[in-house]
Amino acid sequence: MGIKGLTGLLSQHAPKAIKEIKTLFGRKVAIDASMSIYQFLIAVRQKDGELLTNDAGETTRYLMGLFYRTLRIVENGIKPAYIFDGKPPELKKGVLSKRLERREEAKEEGEEAKETGTVEDVDRFSRRTVKVTREHNQECQRLLRLMGIPVVIAPSEAEAQCAELARGGKVYIALYYAAGSEDMDTLTFNAPILFRHLTFSEAKKQPISEINLKEALEGPLYSFPTFIDLCILLGCDYLEPIKGVGPKSALKLIREYGGLKGVVKHLREKAATQKAAQAAVESDEESEHEEEDEPAPTSDVEMPDPVEEDQDGEEEAEPKSSQATPKKKKASSKTKEKRKGKGGGGMQIPEEWPWEEAKKIFKRPSHVHRDLEWTNPDVDGLVQFLVNEKGFNEDRVRKGAEKLQKFLNSKQQGRLDGFFSVKPKEKAAAPAPVGKAKGKGKIDAKAKGTKRKVDEKAESSAGKKPRKK
């Protein structure tokens, strides 16, 4: 899911943090494997929304996409490493269960769309039912290892492992192009630099975006803990979003209350005040209903002859009651609308919202220390797996293996920024005082004093006259 609205906030309040670059040539990049596999699964489908299969009925689209996309990355002078998710944190189980519910709902709606809907409806609902399974991951890991591409299985979140590799200077982090995606979690895991829109598709030519965390923290936030607070408030994968909080209001709240702790306290107090006000309105409304149900106290006294005057009284009372009743109903409806407006609008924080646990995951994520190594592809293994088992074209597989051997084994041309480092400008030296010669080097105060004494002694000895005997 990512961090909602973070890209827009950085563009507005920390524009120096985002810049466009033309190429990642000569870089080593870490790629979130699950996200990539998911995109390949939903990319090409049949008219009925089902996945493309081979002659044996097996789904192979994700393997084909991973094989050829990785080839294009390598051909562009980039060395990729794929990071796979491990066991999800306990805090994420609630989000995963809700995703499962949404997939089941989409499956039912998709079946209805096949009967009454359009092709677009069927495709839309079928995309929502896609899930990356353990079998998908295992087959992709096998393919990548045969290609000579490093595979890292994270102990927990793949984004956290990517950030660890990036902090160690082993890789940069790159994301494939994904329309409308806000996959910025890696920054919250303290990744120094994130590259987005990594694509080599002719139909989706778009410059690569580089997001620099250090530049982002020099904007309106100034500290990494505050940045984490903002990301959690915007909405992350571990907590339900707070209704009524958008990017602008989130930044305003963080600034006003100094962090997420103060924001949560403020929202809790506000919710308690609204709840008390709502209870008071309901109590007043109940007392009004009780008064309406009580009989009029003078009705028995003013009717000595119940038979005759009851008929006349009914004729006279009907118009009065018909006029009075709507007023009371109108007043009660206004009260209900007022009560509904108080309880249903504004910012609403869930009763259970363990933001402290989410912050711990971002500050101290689970990761492993790994060295990455790119090796020669196993050509025979690729032919056995892709051609004999999955029905791929043998000529294309062998040509792809040749490209891998060529680009992975060739000595990679270095980047200029690998030879030079930017240094801050040194302050200009103060001009020497008039009448004193400029020395060629730096002489400390002690050396200067010693030299001055030697010069004075030489001058005095030269000016002395010899003594007469």
Curated annotation (Swiss-Prot):
Residues 274-354, 424-469 are annotated as: Disordered. It comes from Laccaria bicolor (strain S238N-H82 / ATCC MYA-4686) (Bicoloured deceiver). One of its GO terms (cellular component) is mitochondrion. InterPro entries: 5-3_exonuclease_C_sf (IPR036279), Flap_endonuc (IPR023426), HhH2 (IPR008918), PIN-like_dom_sf (IPR029060), XPG-I_dom (IPR006086), XPG/Rad2 (IPR006084), XPG_CS (IPR019974), XPG_DNA_repair_N (IPR006085). Its EC number is 3.1.-.-. SUPFAM superfamilies: 5' to 3' exonuclease, C-terminal subdomain, PIN domain-like. Phosphorylated. Phosphorylation upon DNA damage induces relocalization to the nuclear plasma. This is Flap endonuclease 1-B. It holds the Pfam family XPG_I. Residues 412-420 are annotated as: Interaction with PCNA. Its cofactor is Mg(2+). Mg(2+) 2 binds at residues 183, 185, 237. Mg(2+) 1 binds at residues 32, 85, 157, 159. SMART domains: HhH2, XPGI, XPGN. PROSITE patterns: XPG_1, XPG_2. Keywords: DNA damage, DNA repair, DNA replication, Endonuclease, Exonuclease, Hydrolase, Magnesium, Metal-binding, Mitochondrion, Nuclease, Nucleus, Phosphoprotein. Residues 1-103 are annotated as: N-domain. Residues 282-295, 302-317 have a biased composition (Acidic residues). Binds 2 magnesium ions per subunit. They probably participate in the reaction catalyzed by the enzyme. May bind an additional third magnesium ion after substrate binding. HAMAP family: Fen. DNA binds at residues 45, 69, 157, 235, 237. Residues 326-342 have a biased composition (Basic residues). Residues 441-459 have a biased composition (Basic and acidic residues).
